[in-house]
């Protein structure tokens, strides 16, 4: 690519984004919850084509540049897509085998409704710290907590908000987290130094979040004890509830603790759940298969939609699963989002818009605020948190050094802006995935993800206060 290539102005660069927002708004307004069935994907592809048209026609950007950028983006999310498909099989297997119903049954007896939201946030935070993966946390214990919360009468938006807030706190500060490792490495900050520095903004954000969830736990009206008893009875009538089923979550936790790769861990957990389904729930498998064929029932649980008539409408909705096939709309959306991100990068539009943020970087607060806004913008346009972290780190590293700020300030701000906001964007890989796993739309849970909303604001507030932000001699190494 020629270095003399004309770069689109920021105003022109905004045109594809304006079109995307407009088309997504129209799609959601028209199709509602069915927008992911194809409307959102067509919106992304149409906007991608519009971006390519502008670049090729007016700025002479060769098609090969677009092809390369899009290919790189898609290859970068290949692992995430495989994980997503396995999670589809795992969620079905954990449900039909009775693992999730068992967790729900005993969880209802242990967790008091008044403290449910705060407890959910803390549980997900602890598990996510240990696993280093918000996706794994949400796909396993998150689904069980969703069931407990629904049984207790909580709105699904509140439950999902508590689950995601806790899971992304853990994902953010865990030394096992890919985003944490990526943010520290891209800014050349030692991992544990990066984590310690993040605690300055992350801890108060979590405390505020827990206060909100604790207060709302007492305010929100929940179901009566009799209603929950009926729900528990329906669980026992439908599934074989036994503590033996908890061996699978235990084995999964051991594999995670031993740092077995996510794909292998999730696959083993899925297979173990399938075996448990054969041992403990053979009648359910026959019901799913529609005939006396347990093997067919297991396979259908892994790959397709399953429905059981439990006699309790809430429980019937809860135990319905979609398997790997249920993830295909999300996979399709991810691929289309990667096309849009690649087109914006290859055309130079992404760089043109982010350069606007750089112009406002004067003092300490504006430096951090510009980084936060840029990171959030990249999450919106590239639709992938890993790409956003890499671009934010590379884009601002020299600027931070020239202005005398430590690299750890950049690494912390990058995570505050990118990692935690990714599940709040409907077309971002994280937003799409969590909405699919929890079966709650992104816009439904967004207002209740207090940790994710507060974190970037806390980053700017701490910068304004100036706590632990030290300017170094401009040309000295760290």
Where do the model's predicted regions map?
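Hydrophobic transmembrane alpha-helices of multi-pass small-molecule transporters
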Residues: 1-84, 200-210, 214-333, 476-478
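Short hydrophobic alpha-helical membrane-embedded segments
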Residues: 13-17, 116-119, 239-249, 366-369, ...
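C-terminal transmembrane helix pair
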Residues: 14, 186-202, 206, 342, ...
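Alpha-helical transmembrane segments in multi-pass membrane proteins
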Residues: 20, 43, 47, 51, ...
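Membrane-embedded alpha-helical segments and adjacent helix-loop junctions characteristic
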Residues: 59-150, 309-397
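Alpha-helical transmembrane segments and their lipid-water interface positions
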Residues: 83, 170, 174-182, 209-213, ...
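Transmembrane helix interruption/hinge and helix-loop junction motifs
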Residues: 153-155, 257-263, 382-383, 440-441
């Amino acid at each position: 690519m020629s270095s003399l290539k004309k770069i689109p102005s920021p105003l022109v660069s905004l045109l594809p984004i304006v079109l995307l927002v407009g088309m997504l708004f129209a799609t959601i307004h028209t199709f509602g919850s069915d927008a992911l069935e194809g409307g959102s994907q067509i919106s992304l592809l149409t906007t991608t084509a519009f971006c390519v048209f502008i670049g090729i026609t007016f700025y002479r950007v060769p098609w090969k540049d677009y092809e390369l950028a899009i290919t790189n983006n898609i290859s970068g999310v290949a692992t995430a897509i495989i994980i997503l498909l396995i999670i589809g099989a795992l969620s079905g297997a954990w449900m039909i085998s009775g693992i999730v119903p068992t967790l729900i049954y005993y969880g209802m007896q242990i967790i008091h409704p008044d403290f449910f939201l705060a407890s959910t946030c803390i549980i997900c935070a602890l598990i996510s710290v240990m696993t280093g993966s918000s996706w794994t946390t949400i796909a396993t214990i998150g689904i069980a907590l969703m069931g407990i919360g629904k049984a207790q009468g909580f709105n699904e938006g509140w439950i999902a908000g508590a689950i995601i807030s806790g899971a992304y706190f853990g994902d953010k500060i865990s030394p096992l987290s890919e985003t944490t490792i990526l943010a520290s490495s891209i800014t050349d900050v030692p991992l544990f130094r990066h984590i310690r520095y993040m605690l300055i903004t992350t801890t108060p954000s979590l405390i505020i979040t827990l206060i909100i969830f604790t207060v709302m736990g007492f305010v929100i009206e929940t179901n009566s004890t009799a209603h929950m008893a009926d729900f528990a009875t329906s669980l026992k009538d439908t599934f074989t509830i036994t503590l033996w089923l908890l061996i699978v979550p235990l084995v999964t936790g051991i594999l995670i603790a031993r740092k077995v790769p996510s794909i292998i861990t999730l696959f083993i957990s899925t297979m173990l759940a399938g075996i448990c389904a054969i041992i403990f729930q053979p009648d359910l498998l026959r019901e799913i298969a529609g005939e006396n064929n347990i093997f067919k029932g297991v396979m259908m649980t892994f790959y397709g939609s399953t429905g059981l008539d439990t006699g309790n409408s809430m429980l019937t909705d809860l135990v319905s699963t979609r398997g790997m096939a249920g993830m295909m709309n999300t996979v399709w959306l991810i691929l289309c989002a990667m096309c849009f991100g690649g087109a914006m990068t290859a055309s130079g539009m992404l760089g043109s818009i982010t350069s606007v943020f750089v112009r406002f970087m004067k003092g300490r607060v504006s430096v951090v605020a510009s980084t936060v806004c840029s990171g959030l913008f990249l999450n919106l346009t590239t639709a992938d948190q890993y790409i956003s972290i890499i671009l934010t780190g590379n884009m601002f590293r020299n600027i931070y050094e020239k202005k005398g700020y430590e690299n750890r300030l950049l690494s912390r701000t990058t995570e505050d802006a990118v990692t935690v906001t990714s599940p709040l964007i409907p077309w971002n890989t994280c937003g799409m995935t969590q909405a699919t796993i929890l079966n709650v739309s992104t816009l439904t849970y967004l207002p209740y993800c207090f940790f994710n909303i507060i974190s970037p604001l806390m980053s700017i507030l701490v910068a304004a206060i100036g706590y632990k932000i030290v300017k170094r001699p401009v040309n000295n190494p760290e």
